[in-house]
């Protein structure tokens, strides 16, 4: 269950705390942000208001509207001095801009200072895909057969991971599938509501269908048509954390690095498709990326992989005069 920042933990006047609570509710229910993002945005706002309080400014709505660009730059500088990464600073600024837009929509005024502050530059980290054999193995229940867990739990985890690698889903998208939409039998496509409320159609290949069917055949809990396809041991919605723990177990069994995460399976889906001459636009549609530039990161991954293999295999690679 989502634990957003309680209004009483925010510094500031009551009207500001109420506005913050309403904003977080909108992010969750209307914008459909992930639980982690809503929690992070609430934390970013709390840290900013605490910074204003330390600086002597009253953290209320009029004070926010009257902010100067230097106030925001001082906050960013203070956070950077604390060792906060550029990526986290960029998210904090996005959170403040989101809250400012909420205040504007509610008639509280425009926080114009935010438009004068640039987002910090962040070097885009290349995704780290898994080797094909490792990705396939992670989606197999046989790898964890020795664990003291019910067979249906192992089958469930394998089905979720098969959807991540075999269909390129985000973990939240896989766990959001309803029972009546389970890709089994004649159902070989999924309608996925992804980031930004964008809907996309995703084909489901036979091995993924088989993994889901295997799970359904052994799941001991009743699964109502409009309820979640994947459930926990007590029959409630499956938590992403449980999937992350399953992947951690698989990392140990397969000897994989810490970068082998559930999201790495989605990266692997894209990179392996591209390596097989997949069309970049088609991969963009399958992943649900709003921008082709986001998908083009995988061309860099594939090029880097090929160059690395060349450097390792060719005796004169990288040498002067080669």
Swiss-Prot record:
* A GO CC annotation given for this chain: cytoplasm
| Domain of life, per lineage | Bacteria
Domain named Core-binding (CB): residues: 14-104
Alphabetical list of SUPFAM superfamilies matching this protein: DNA breaking-rejoining enzymes (SSF56349), lambda integrase-like, N-terminal domain (SSF47823)
Q: In this protein, which residues make up the domain named Tyr recombinase?
A: 125-311
GO biological process terms held by the UniProt record: cell division; chromosome segregation; DNA transposition
Cell cycle among the record's keywords?
Answer: yes
Catalytic site positions: 170, 195, 263, 266, 289, 298 (o-(3'-phospho-dna)-tyrosine intermediate)
Q: Name the keywords, alphabetized.
A: Cell cycle, Cell division, Chromosome partition, Cytoplasm, DNA integration, DNA recombination, DNA-binding
Report the locations given in the UniProt record.
Answer: Cytoplasm
Instruction: Give an example GO molecular function.
Output: DNA binding
Entries under InterPro entries matching the protein: CB (IPR044068), DNA_brk_join_enz (IPR011010), Integrase-like_cat_sf (IPR013762), Integrase_catalytic (IPR002104), Integrase_recombinase_N (IPR010998), Integrase_SAM-like_N (IPR004107), Tyrosine_recombinase_XerC/XerD (IPR023009), Tyrosine_recombinase_XerCD (IPR050090)
Q: How does it assemble?
A: Forms a cyclic heterotetrameric complex composed of two molecules of XerC and two molecules of XerD.
Write down the PANTHER family for this protein, in alphabetical order: PHAGE INTEGRASE-RELATED, TYROSINE RECOMBINASE XERD
- What role does this protein play? Site-specific tyrosine recombinase, which acts by catalyzing the cutting and rejoining of the recombining DNA molecules. The XerC-XerD complex is essential to convert dimers of the bacterial chromosome into monomers to permit their segregation at cell division. It also contributes to the segregational stability of plasmids.
What is the designated name of this protein?
Tyrosine recombinase XerC
Q: Species name for this entry? A: Methylobacterium nodulans (strain LMG 21967 / CNCM I-2342 / ORS 2060)
Q: What gene name does this entry carry?
A: xerC
